[in-house]
């Protein structure tokens, strides 16, 4: 009985990881393309968010030639001393913490304009890349093997083999997802390549500490490693746009939507006629040459 009580207590603790603020009253309104949800004292932020979202809608959707089938939900929260945004692209929902972000590793940008555009690009680009639509996030092929039956009254023998092969519904690596979300669209000015970002990339370049192509395809790093995935992805997306045209970013996403395409390396090759690893080598060589010239001026 004691173990049952302990189990129930632990279940309650881990089942309530976030306080849901039951004291708040929530409100909603709709615009042409969005459903906006906000709570007490956040109406001004919600109204501004709606204006921003409608302003950037055509730019983002035309860049990727894709529109959501339904209105996108935007939830505005201002309950914590915290700033962030999240895109739930299978749910067609964006959550925004309204407080402006003061992030030392990036320059100063207008918060709501920046974060709403960033997250909406996630919604559009990742939905564009889906192989099976928003209703099927993935699938598994499984095979189970069994020992030979030893008794006539037993239908199956003891299971001795399990083969499971996951089939993801999206296969966009972090560097590309975050890189194009920071790039946003042609002529976008809410987020820019600022001196803070350049400092991080320059330091890694001149100290031969750039992340590898495989490393920028995952998160889970220490220190500024995760930020460097954002940073390098943004720089690489800008490089692709400059060298091959911004349409290449959309075409890579389209290629990754192919049900049989699960390699960004091959997707890049099919679009740019150069595989991802060689593209990244060219990108690194360009960075080294550029920063060598710049640092020679101050030596």
What is each model feature region?
Residues 3-12:
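Sec-dependent N-terminal signal peptides
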Residues 4, 16, 24, 219-220:
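Alpha-helical interaction segments
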Residues 16-166:
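Juxtacatalytic substrate-recognition/specificity segment
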Residues 21-22, 91-93, 111-115, 123, ...:
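Acidic/His/Gly-enriched intrinsically disordered linker/tail segments
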């Amino acid at each position: 009985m004691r173990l049952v009580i302990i189990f129930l207590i632990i279940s309650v603790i881990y089942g309530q990881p976030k306080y849901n603020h039951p004291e708040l009253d929530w409100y909603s309104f709709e615009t042409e393309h969005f459903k906006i949800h906000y709570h007490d004292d956040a109406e001004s932020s919600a109204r501004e968010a709606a204006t921003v979202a409608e302003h950037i809608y055509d730019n983002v959707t035309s860049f990727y030639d894709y529109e959501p089938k339904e209105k996108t939900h935007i939830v505005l929260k201002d309950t914590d001393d915290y700033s962030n945004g999240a895109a739930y692209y299978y749910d067609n929902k964006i959550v925004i913490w309204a407080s402006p972000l003061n992030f030392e590793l990036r320059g100063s940008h207008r918060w709501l304009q920046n974060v709403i555009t960033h997250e909406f690009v996630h919604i559009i680009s990742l939905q564009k890349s889906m192989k099976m639509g928003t209703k099927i996030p993935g699938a598994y092929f499984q095979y189970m093997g069994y020992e030979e039956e030893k008794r006539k009254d037993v239908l199956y023998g003891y299971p001795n083999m399990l083969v499971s092969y996951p089939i993801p519904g999206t296969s966009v690596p972090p560097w590309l997802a975050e890189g194009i979300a920071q790039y946003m669209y042609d002529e976008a000015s809410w987020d820019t390549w600022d001196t803070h970002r350049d400092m991080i990339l320059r330091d890694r370049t001149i100290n031969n500490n750039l992340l590898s192509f495989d490393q920028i395809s995952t998160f889970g790093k220490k220190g500024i490693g995760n930020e460097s995935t954002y940073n390098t992805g943004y720089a690489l997306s800008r490089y692709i746009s400059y060298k091959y045209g911004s349409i290449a970013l959309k075409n890579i996403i389209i290629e990754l939507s192919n049900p049989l395409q699960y390699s960004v390396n091959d997707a890049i090759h099919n679009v740019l006629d150069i595989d991802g690893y060689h593209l990244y080598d060219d990108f690194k060589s360009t960075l080294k040459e550029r920063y060598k010239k710049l640092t020679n001026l101050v030596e």
